[in-house]
Design a protein with these regions (language model features):
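Arg/Lys-rich amphipathic alpha helix in sigma70-family domain 2
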Residues: 51, 57-58, 68-89, 101-105, ...
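Internal acidic/polar
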Residues: 84-113, 133
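C-terminal flanking helix
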Residues: 21, 25, 46, 117, ...
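Structural recognition of an alpha-helix C-terminal capping motif at a helix-to-coil junction
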Residues: 40-47, 60-72
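A short pre-motif secondary-structure segment
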Residues: 123-127
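A short, charge-rich alpha-helical start-of-domain segment used by transcription regulators
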Residues: 2-26, 36-39
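Residues within helix-turn-helix
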Residues: 36, 135, 146
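DNA-recognition helix of helix-turn-helix
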Residues: 71, 75, 141-165
Length: 173
């Protein structure tokens, strides 16, 4: 890539970063309940966008590609942490899942969302915080629109139930 082309790529990716970084981080923070992890995932996605710009510049939705990369990073981190937790439990002689901490209801929305099943949490964050359409959420999660509607319905029902009764929310994961 020549210097002029590289400058244009940097300017384009920088412009996308300024326009979308905050919204992506907010949505993914609700999805993973950790601002730093969400920010790292989004930053890494933008770095990858810069590195692969020649290819993704032709996509219909480059920001969707960036969002997908960030979500994949969160999923990879989650899988890695889950495997690490199971390994530590086995080393300690505990059956996996027995020492999983149960969280109670809290008026803090991110804490409540963090306790929803992962797909519901991510779908709700992308739909309500990132303001994506059902079709865009489906594309980002690589599921059908019907699945997204189901995740949103189940998530709203679960949150309504929690708010109405003050019961504890426990993840089905």
């Amino acid at each position: 890539m020549n210097e002029v082309t590289e400058v244009k790529v940097v300017e384009t990716v920088d412009s996308l970063f300024r326009a979308h970084y905050g919204r992506l981080v907010r949505a993914l923070t609700l999805a993973c309940n950790d601002h730093e992890v969400a920010a790292d995932a989004v930053q890494e996605a933008f770095v990858k966008a810069h590195l692969h710009w020649r290819r993704i510049q032709h996509y219909d939705d480059p920001v969707g590609w960036i969002r997908r990369v960030a979500i994949n990073r969160l999923r990879d981190d989650h899988r890695r942490q889950s495997r690490k937790g199971v390994a530590l439990q086995r080393l300690a002689g505990e059956p996996p899942g027995e020492s999983v901490e149960q969280h109670g209801f809290d008026s803090d929305l991110p804490a409540i969302l963090a306790q929803l099943p992962r797909q519901q949490r991510i779908a709700m964050a992308l739909f309500y915080v990132d303001e994506l359409s059902v079709a865009e959420v489906a594309s980002a999660l690589k599921v059908t629109e019907g699945a997204v509607k189901s995740y949103l319905h189940q998530g709203r029902a679960r949150l309504r139930s929690v708010v109405a009764s003050g019961e504890e929310v426990h993840s089905d994961e």
